[in-house]
Amino acid sequence: PIDIYNHGKMKRDFTYIDDLINCIYELSKIIPENKNNLLKVSNDDSLSSSAPWRVVNIGNNNPVNLMNFITEIEKCLGKKAIKNFMDIQKGDVPNTWSENKLLRELIGFAPETKVSSGIKNFVNWYQSYYSHKNEKE
């Protein structure tokens, strides 16, 4: 069984791995504009273009209902999950999402792979990988 917290009343902003890799690759090409200013930037200013580092959210900016996510996995697998509905965990939040405005400004795009496509791709990869692995054993 899978534990489903807050009785499934949650939303999450899922990001497909290929999108994540592409964004990180593009971000790695961005070099601070003025190397002479690196020492003048305060350590807490991660948004400065001359900081030696920067925090950038990478995500679809499109929260998905957890139950829809599970239904999509069930559809791809052709199986119904055994669900164990539970109360929300202490400290958890019902909804999360990624603000990707800075990401779009920096690299000109943000992740856009639909959750249904990402799940389908992942399930296909997983089944293929583990069927080949099991054949070798």
Put a short name on every predicted segment.
Residues 1-137:
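C-terminal substrate-binding subdomain of Rossmann-fold SDR/epimerase-dehydratase oxidoreductases
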